[in-house]
Amino acid sequence: MFYYIYEILNFNIFQYITVRAGIAFFIAFILTAYLMPKFIAWAKAKNAAQPIYELAPQTHQKKAKTPTMGGLVFVFTAVIATIICARLDNAFVLASLFCLVCFTLLGYKDDYSKILGAKNHAGLSPKAKLFFQFLIAFLLAAFLYISKELNTEFYLPFYKQPIFDMKIFAIFFWTLVIVAASNAVNLTDGLDGLAAVPSIFSLLTLGVFAYICGHAVFSSYLLLPKIAGVGESVVVASALIGSLMGFLWFNCHPAEVFMGDSGSLSVGAYIGFMGVATKNEILLIIIGLIFVVETLSVILQVGSFKIFKRRIFLMAPIHHHFEIKGWAENKIIVRFWIIALLANLIALTALKIR
């Protein structure tokens, strides 16, 4: 809307991505802060609380009546802010909206199965969830490939030249990145605010890369790939950051609401999408370091138990390991936030080390 005000009335300030990103941030934040208490009241009335896994640490049992599916609210507000502030004729914006909406709906279906439906903590079967994740991600990747909006060259962090051209195999690689990121954030969402803040850091870093890659002068100076149109996705990322900060107001310890799969699956998928859109698929390992560590802890735990019949951690994901060791929840959360911040600062050095 704001961009078209610029086109119609020649109100120049609205042509700038940074201005519209800032407006999107505040719209999403204010809307989330306004709507979330109403959603919490509704969720409590409907008993839409997160079922607690019976083997979870005992400290989690007191969270049994905490409402979930907060992701429905903050993704909704991010989408509204995007529609108001972004250019809707931009392929990356349209793909972003598709990513957020579809993964949120998938997460909602999973949450519904857990809470309002079957009343079990498992929700959708792992096979069903994974199938739909791959389907949505494949459609996203295929759109990027067919539209020619994104080249298929493979880049490594801190190296300015592409390594090789993936050609049509880029579709499958991009699909895998989006699904992996979606599940990684989902696994991390186990403590109050643990997934939200690292997600904000990741989106900030990816937003910086998107803005530079979409800018002809900056991308040339910093030796980043020039990706026409990707800068507009900064508006979407900014809207999602604003909505996540509004959500964090109610999700910080002790949480009044959880994001649920409707939030974690969509936020993770969008982080993966932004990594793909900015050619930072491998750098995502550093940008989303906390998510990677959480996921690896689960993979190692399952693999070790199946092969050696022994567990590496007291419980996986790894944040539960520290809980059982006696760390206070707040201490785990803040330390993980610090690690996430440092990892993103390191990732940003890739702007100069090329």
Curated annotation (Swiss-Prot):
Q: What is its EC number?
A: 2.7.8.13
Is Repeat tagged as a keyword? Answer: no
What membrane topology does this protein have? Multi-pass membrane protein
InterPro entries from the entry?
Glycosyl_transferase_4, PNAcMuramoyl-5peptid_Trfase, PNAcMuramoyl-5peptid_Trfase_CS
Q: What is the lineage of its organism?
A: Bacteria, Pseudomonadati, Campylobacterota, Epsilonproteobacteria, Campylobacterales
This enzyme catalyses:
UDP-N-acetyl-alpha-D-muramoyl-L-alanyl-gamma-D-glutamyl-meso-2,6-diaminopimeloyl-D-alanyl-D-alanine + di-trans,octa-cis-undecaprenyl phosphate = di-trans,octa-cis-undecaprenyl diphospho-N-acetyl-alpha-D-muramoyl-L-alanyl-D-glutamyl-meso-2,6-diaminopimeloyl-D-alanyl-D-alanine + UMP
Tell me the route in metabolism or biology where this protein functions: Cell wall biogenesis; peptidoglycan biosynthesis
Q: Which UniProt keywords apply?
A: Cell cycle, Cell division, Cell inner membrane, Cell membrane, Cell shape, Cell wall biogenesis/degradation, Magnesium, Membrane, Metal-binding, Peptidoglycan synthesis, Transferase, Transmembrane, Transmembrane helix
Q: State which residue ranges cross the membrane.
A: 23-43, 66-86, 88-108, 130-150, 168-188, 193-213, 230-250, 257-277, 282-302, 331-351
* Designated name of the protein: Phospho-N-acetylmuramoyl-pentapeptide-transferase
HAMAP family with a match to the protein in the record: MraY
Keyword Iron-sulfur listed? The answer is no
Q: Which organism is it from?
A: Campylobacter concisus (strain 13826)
- Supply the CDD domains for this chain: GT_MraY (cd06852)
* Broad class of where this protein is predominantly found: membrane
Which gene is the coding source of this polypeptide chain? mraY
